[in-house]
Amino acid sequence: MFSRIALLPAFLPVALACLGYEGGVPTPTAHYSNSAVIEIAAGEVFDAGWAKYDRGSGACGGQTEGDWKDAVFYLHSGATLKNVIIGADQSEGVHCDGACTLEFVWFEDVCEDAISIKNDKEGEETWIIGGGAYHADDKVVQHNGCGTVNIINFYAEDYGKVYRSCGNCSSQCKRNVYVEGTTARDGGEVVGINQSFGDTATLVNVCTDADHPCVLYDGCEGDCEPSKVGYCSG
């Protein structure tokens, strides 16, 4: 059953609006395969003009975790990436070193993680606006920093988790996620957060068929495995 979730009962419009674009990945205007990651400097904006970028045939190694050098794009703090399609031939999609902004970034077939956010500080905000991701066996957004991730009008289909707060980073902290106007189909959890570290999740106008859109974990530090402990309420 497809449902609409609003975990904030106050200050909501009368009609729920799930605005994730459901028309599929946009048709690319060009296609570039690069042997190395593309870096976007702090504060700069990279507008791809709806071109598709990847790392070449055979780049995806399944769920083998890579680092920023394996990504298609590497954004330094405050950088913006917009109007781009990340092709299937990649190990890691987009890495952000600090808070970043992604506007209309599409992932046609996620390999390990689509978006990894690291080193953002408490009080800093990452914005993921529009765009979407298909076929993420595990996570679409992996959040290892300590700030807030805002996911607005996103679309996800065939996924494990749209957002996951790092369950076993070597140094843990409180993280926040805000999801609004997002559509998530044929997947697992919309968000997974660590109850043990005080994480917060707010879901507003989220359309999903997930049995439990927001899942709580007992996160841990280092060489350990976080355990699922319950579900969010609101």
Curated annotation (Swiss-Prot):
Q: Does the keyword Lyase apply?
A: yes
Give the encoding gene's name: plyF
Q: Where in the cell is it found?
A: Secreted
Query: What is catalyzed by this enzyme?
Result: Eliminative cleavage of (1->4)-alpha-D-galacturonan to give oligosaccharides with 4-deoxy-alpha-D-galact-4-enuronosyl groups at their non-reducing ends
The keyword Transferase appears for this protein: no
Q: Which cofactor does it need?
A: Ca(2+)
The cross-references to SUPFAM superfamilies, in alphabetical order and at most eight, read: Pectin lyase-like
* Role according to the record: Pectinolytic enzyme consist of four classes of enzymes: pectin lyase, polygalacturonase, pectin methylesterase and rhamnogalacturonase. Among pectinolytic enzymes, pectin lyase is the most important in depolymerization of pectin, since it cleaves internal glycosidic bonds of highly methylated pectins. Favors pectate, the anion, over pectin, the methyl ester.
Name recorded for this polypeptide: Probable pectate lyase F
Task: Cite the entry's keywords alphabetically.
Answer: Calcium, Carbohydrate metabolism, Cell wall biogenesis/degradation, Glycoprotein, Lyase, Polysaccharide degradation, Secreted, Signal
- Source organism, top-level taxon: Eukaryota
Q: Which Gene3D superfamilies match?
A: Single-stranded right-handed beta-helix, Pectin lyase-like
Recorded source organism is Aspergillus flavus (strain ATCC 200026 / FGSC A1120 / IAM 13836 / NRRL 3357 / JCM 12722 / SRRC 167)
